[in-house]
From Swiss-Prot:
UniProt PTM: Contains 2 disulfide bonds.
Location in the cell: Secreted
Signal sequence, renumbered to the chain: 1-24
Keyword terms of this UniProt record: Disulfide bond, Secreted, Signal, Toxin
Source organism: Ethmostigmus rubripes (Giant centipede)
Protein name, per record: U-scoloptoxin(04)-Er1a
Keyword Disulfide bond carried by entry: yes
Propeptide residue intervals: 25-28
Gene Ontology MF terms in the entry: toxin activity
Length: 78
């Protein structure tokens, strides 16, 4: 009986450790994709800070509309 309890306890600990490892990996993955989206948004801003013409301004607006992290189009109007 004691062996069964020890085995069950060890099994639960292993399950808990594996569950936390998977959760940590998901959290890192989510952080990484959020970081990538922010980097992409910053790159779009850098590209269009000094637009050389109307065509680039329109491209800026299109890029901003397609980006989920873009809250406003202020940098496109400069």
């Amino acid at each position: 009986m004691t062996r069964h309890l020890i085995f069950a306890a060890v099994l639960l600990v292993c399950l808990f450790v594996c569950w936390n490892a998977i959760g940590a990996q998901d959290a890192r993955s989510a952080f990484s994709s959020e970081e990538t989206a922010q980097d992409q948004h910053v790159m779009e801003e850098r590209i269009f800070i000094n637009p050389a013409g109307n065509r680039e301004k329109n491209a800026c607006l299109e890029n901003c509309r397609s980006s989920p992290n873009c809250k406003n189009y202020e940098f496109c109007s400069k």
